[in-house]
Amino acid sequence: GSSGIIPFPRV
């Protein structure tokens, strides 16, 4: 969900 250094998936 984030578009930073580490993209986290939306859960």
UniProtKB/Swiss-Prot annotation:
Top-level taxon of the source organism: Eukaryota
Sorted UniProt keywords: Amidation, Neuropeptide, Secreted
UniProt modified residues of type Valine amide: 11
InterPro entries per UniProt: Periviscerokinin
Example of a GO biological process term: neuropeptide signaling pathway
Cellular localisation: Secreted
Expression (tissue specificity): Expressed in abdominal perisympathetic organs and abdominal ganglia.
Keyword Secreted: yes
Gene Ontology CC annotations of this record: extracellular region
Similarity comment: family membership: Belongs to the periviscerokinin family.
Function: Mediates visceral muscle contractile activity (myotropic activity).
Name of the featured protein: Periviscerokinin-3
